[in-house]
A protein has these predicted regions:
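Amphipathic alpha-helical segments that form the core helices of the histone-fold
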Residues: 136-147
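Globin-like tetrapyrrole-binding proteins
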Residues: 157
Length: 171
């Protein structure tokens, strides 16, 4: 009998650092250089390994996504799934910037063909092709977004993919 890995392990949400790195990688903006100075800037393209945690600033992205407390020795991180995490993905400027960069990259990769651009975004965000039903839903979302505000609808689709369970969890 075939045993699928999803039968053996439950899906888990990405921790703060891998989630931030995945967002930057999806946009093609992750700086993979090793070494060098750390930074306090969440908007830096450096891997999260190089983002310093200020002990006095516990109201940040990492804390929202269950980062370890730097003031204590902990054997494991607490895991939570709470509304502020979804609100962060919906509203934070970093996610918006990543979605815009992804949309721009998709336009360069498949400039005229909407279906190819949808496929490009799915591959970049989810590492797979969309199903025919997902392609139709994405096409409808693009039409609705274009009618609603008249702007470029592609960042909206990119943002939807970045906010979905499939992006923020690991099977």
């Amino acid at each position: 009998s075939d045993v699928c890995s999803s039968d053996l392990f439950s899906a888990r949400r990405l921790e703060a650092e891998p989630l931030r790195d995945a967002l930057l990688a999806a946009s093609g903006g992750l700086d993979l250089r090793s070494g060098g100075p750390a930074t306090h800037e969440l908007g830096s393209p450096r891997r999260s390994l190089y983002i310093q945690t200020a002990r006095w600033d516990r109201a940040n992205f990492a804390t929202l996504f269950d980062a370890a407390n730097p003031d204590a020795s902990v054997e494991g991180r607490a895991v939570s799934t709470v509304a502020p995490q979804a609100l962060f993905l919906m509203n934070h400027a970093i996610v918006s910037e990543v979605a815009c960069r992804m949309a721009g990259e998709a336009a360069r990769g498949a400039p005229k063909d909407g279906t190819a651009r949808i496929r490009w975004l799915f591959r970049r965000a989810l590492s797979r092709d969309p199903t025919p039903a997902e392609t139709e839903i994405a096409s409808q979302l693009l039409r609705d977004a274009a009618e609603a505000d008249g702007g470029d609808p592609w960042p909206s689709l990119a943002r939807v993919l970045l906010m979905g369970n499939e992006f923020v969890t690991v099977d």
